């Protein structure tokens, strides 16, 4: 990614909700790749609304927004919506779903070597295995379990086998934050990310960012 490249800008953005309440008025904002920006304001000042507009979640605004479509945006809401049927580990793994899928495909390919194959089938399988190996190495997939464990430990997540349905609001936020950080978005939007984090976790997050 090129330094000093503007990857997002908004021009004259306003947000009005019924009956006629102005939440945001005539906002101009641009930021470069790699920039770290804090949005400060009193409760109800429109901070969360601004982040939702940047994240593309709230399309109901006036003004103009331009951003590079090649960049992935990740957003942590104050009250994340997580699947209550999943475990903590299930949700965290969603942040590295592409790698998880590649590992599964790699295991399926390896399992096929136990079958009776023609020479052509064997050659195709070897070629496919090589392609998957290259992709996995590029993504440091062999260290995935360690990476997940370190992130979950740093953010003091509950037991990986715990159901999302039994977690408190603060625990859900930490799970969602862990998933988001592991997904490594180009634009990371965090709405009050240090809420429900202890001092050590806050320090880890600051170092990570």
Question: Model-found features: residue ranges?
Answer:
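ABC ATP-binding cassette signature C-motif
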Residues: 1-209
């Amino acid at each position: 990614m090129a330094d000093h490249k503007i990857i997002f800008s908004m021009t004259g953005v306003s947000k009005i909700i019924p009956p006629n309440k102005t939440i945001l008025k005539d906002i101009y904002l641009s930021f470069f790749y790699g920039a770290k920006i804090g949005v400060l304001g009193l409760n109800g000042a429109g901070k969360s609304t601004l982040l939702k507009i940047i994240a593309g979640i709230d399309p109901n605004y006036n003004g103009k927004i331009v951003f590079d479509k090649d960049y992935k945006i990740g957003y942590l809401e104050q009250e994340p919506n997580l699947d209550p049927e999943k475990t903590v580990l299930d949700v965290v793994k969603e942040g590295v779903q592409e790698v998880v899928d590649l590992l599964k495909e790699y295991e399926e390919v390896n399992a096929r070597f136990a079958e009776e194959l023609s020479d052509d089938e064997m050659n195709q399988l070897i070629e496919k295995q090589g392609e998957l190996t290259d992709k996995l190495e590029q993504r440091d997939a062999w260290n995935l379990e360690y990476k997940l464990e370190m992130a979950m430990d740093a953010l003091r997540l509950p037991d990986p086998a715990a159901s999302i349905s039994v977690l408190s609001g603060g625990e859900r936020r930490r799970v969602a934050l862990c998933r988001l950080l592991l997904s490594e978005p180009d634009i990371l939007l965090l709405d009050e990310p240090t809420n429900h984090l202890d001092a050590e976790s806050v320090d880890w997050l600051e170092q990570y960012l």
